[in-house]
């Protein structure tokens, strides 16, 4: 007995469970607190010039200010030309480009997180990030395919099954990724892994959701896609030009190069541009008609009878303005009035998407999201305002433009059982008869 007591006294006292968890939390906390210093050490980009050699030689005699002006200008014209080309190629190509832009933006944001924390060797971080991107895209675009390609989906048996159980399949895919994340948790990196889990989901919310709304805007008519994007591009260009030549007063600390002169000049230029572009595009059916799938030709069609938004109307000019310009009325498309709201948002609120991105880049001490486009940075640097604009346009259409869609009602009607269809038919017939829109003679026939 004495020997046993001596042995117990010699053995070190086992640490209580609370102390163990406390030490774990402390170690984990130290790991998280080190992340800020890691940002400086890891993500500081090398000061390399990504300008093409041809432009470097041609602009070698210019100052850095004017060299940047010409580089940005030339690349901007190239991007505008590319934008015209993809518009000419039609809605299907536009949707593919939107998907490519979405994937590239996601890659740029996730890469920043990976560069900061890759030294910790977090298991499955990149794999799970891309897996969740696949899951979310399957969920969103599966719904879109069902909505806009209903007859095609119902015609093909595999697509019909996928459509019927779409949400369950989407949930199962996400749940699989969730379980994989839980299984990947490592004792010394708990907090950091949850940081990156949140990082991935916020990125998905910003990038995938917004690009999904862009696709929906496109299906409402190409004009709802082209005008908002063009307004953001115009505001970006004109704000830069006004700021370059007249900028004196700083606008916001997050972006020291942004000035009030550029902000105000960009606003007025964008409103005028939006009115002119809307006037030109409203006269073409290929721009104003909703994008629909034709089952007979298995292709997209943009042919319809334009709605009242795209028919010229005469408006009375306020008396104050009449005395200045001498006109009493003006003929314009109702859509031009809506374009003022779009261009105003693109000029006054849209830049805050850029300020948000600037704050993000400052937090990680990087200049650009990537160096994909010389003089401009990454793809995300060009689309930081576009995503905010896409959300506004979608909400604007749903609130002020879109009404009941007869074609979708017919699609839903055709999915019902025959007895349900007959019940709706009799109810509708009685309703139309009571309204006097369906006479007894017509009913007998």
Swiss-Prot record:
- Which reaction(s) are listed as its catalytic activity? a 1,2-diacyl-sn-glycero-3-phosphate + CTP + H(+) = a CDP-1,2-diacyl-sn-glycerol + diphosphate; 1-octadecanoyl-2-(5Z,8Z,11Z,14Z-eicosatetraenoyl)-sn-glycero-3-phosphate + CTP + H(+) = 1-octadecanoyl-2-(5Z,8Z,11Z,14Z-eicosatetraenoyl)-sn-glycero-3-cytidine-5'-diphosphate + diphosphate; 1-octadecanoyl-2-(9Z,12Z-octadecadienoyl)-sn-glycero-3-phosphate + CTP + H(+) = 1-octadecanoyl-2-(9Z,12Z-octadecadienoyl)-sn-glycero-3-cytidine-5'-diphosphate + diphosphate; 1-hexadecanoyl-2-(5Z,8Z,11Z,14Z-eicosatetraenoyl)-sn-glycero-3-phosphate + CTP + H(+) = 1-hexadecanoyl-2-(5Z,8Z,11Z,14Z-eicosatetraenoyl)-sn-glycero-3-cytidine-5'-diphosphate + diphosphate
One GO term in the molecular function aspect is: phosphatidate cytidylyltransferase activity
**Residue spans crossing the bilayer:** 79-99, 132-152, 166-186, 213-233, 262-282, 340-360
Q: What's in the keyword line of the UniProt record?
A: Endoplasmic reticulum, Lipid biosynthesis, Lipid metabolism, Membrane, Nucleotidyltransferase, Phospholipid biosynthesis, Phospholipid metabolism, Phosphoprotein, Transferase, Transmembrane, Transmembrane helix
Membrane topology, from the record: Multi-pass membrane protein
Lipid biosynthesis found in the keyword field: yes
The UniProt entry, under InterPro entries, shows: PC_trans, PC_Trfase_euk
- Major localization class: endoplasmic reticulum
The protein's name is Phosphatidate cytidylyltransferase 2
* Organism field: Bos taurus
